[in-house]
């Protein structure tokens, strides 16, 4: 199945000059959604993985079913103020300012091997902040997995010390 063909491209959204890659069309197609999860599963099923870490918001959509299928725990990393209990946070840069992601302080145990999942990697700020949280808790990032890689935005450079896997790439910004 050509998963790339299930992604809708919206020119000039949310601002002029941006080519927005919309995964909702993949999600609306049950065969495509299943295929995406199965491709991730095939990649990780023989690796010793303890947890899948899904990044808010769309990484949660792919991370939770992958964790279920792998029979491992699932850990959500959310934007600041979205999860209860005690958390630790990490900041990352945006075009005009800063944002923060958080994780429960007891979500990952020392030595646990995790795969970080998000829908796409663009500049890499969110995934790098998530890696920092996992490592602060003592976890080991086995790989970062994405549905889409936007290589021209150079996010891979921010996580060059980590393995990375993407189901597809789109050139351009």
From Swiss-Prot:
Enzyme category, top tier: transferase
Cystine residue pairs: none
Domain of life assignment: Bacteria
Annotated localization: Cytoplasm
Pathway connected to this protein: Purine metabolism; AMP biosynthesis via salvage pathway; AMP from adenine: step 1/1
Keyword field: Cytoplasm, Glycosyltransferase, Purine salvage, Transferase
One cellular-component annotation, GO: cytoplasm
Catalytic function, reaction form: AMP + diphosphate = 5-phospho-alpha-D-ribose 1-diphosphate + adenine
Listed GO MF terms: adenine binding; adenine phosphoribosyltransferase activity; AMP binding
Pfam families the UniProt entry points to: Pribosyltran
Main location: cytoplasm
GO biological process: adenine salvage; AMP salvage; purine ribonucleoside salvage
EC number: 2.4.2.7
Family membership noted in the UniProt record: Belongs to the purine/pyrimidine phosphoribosyltransferase family.
UniProt-listed HAMAP family: Aden_phosphoribosyltr
Complex formation: Homodimer.
General function of this protein: Catalyzes a salvage reaction resulting in the formation of AMP, that is energically less costly than de novo synthesis.
Protein name: Adenine phosphoribosyltransferase
């Amino acid at each position: 199945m050509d998963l790339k063909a299930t992604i809708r491209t919206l020119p000039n959204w949310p601002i002029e000059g941006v080519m927005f890659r919309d995964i909702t069309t993949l999600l609306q197609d049950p065969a495509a959604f299943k295929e995406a999860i199965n491709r991730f599963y095939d990649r990780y099923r023989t690796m010793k993985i303890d947890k899948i870490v899904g990044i808010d918001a769309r990484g949660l959509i792919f991370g939770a079913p992958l964790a279920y299928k792998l029979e491992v725990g699932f850990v959500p990393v959310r934007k600041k103020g979205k999860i209860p209990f005690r958390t630790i946070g990490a900041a990352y840069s945006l075009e005009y300012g800063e944002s923060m992601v958080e994780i429960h302080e007891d979500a990952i145990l020392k030595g646990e091997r995790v795969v970080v999942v998000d829908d796409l990697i663009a500049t890499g700020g969110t995934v790098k902040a998530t890696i920092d949280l996992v490592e602060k808790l003592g976890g080991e990032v086995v790989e970062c997995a994405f549905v889409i890689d936007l290589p021209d935005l150079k996010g891979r450079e921010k996580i060059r010390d980590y393995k990375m896997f993407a189901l597809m790439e789109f050139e351009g910004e």
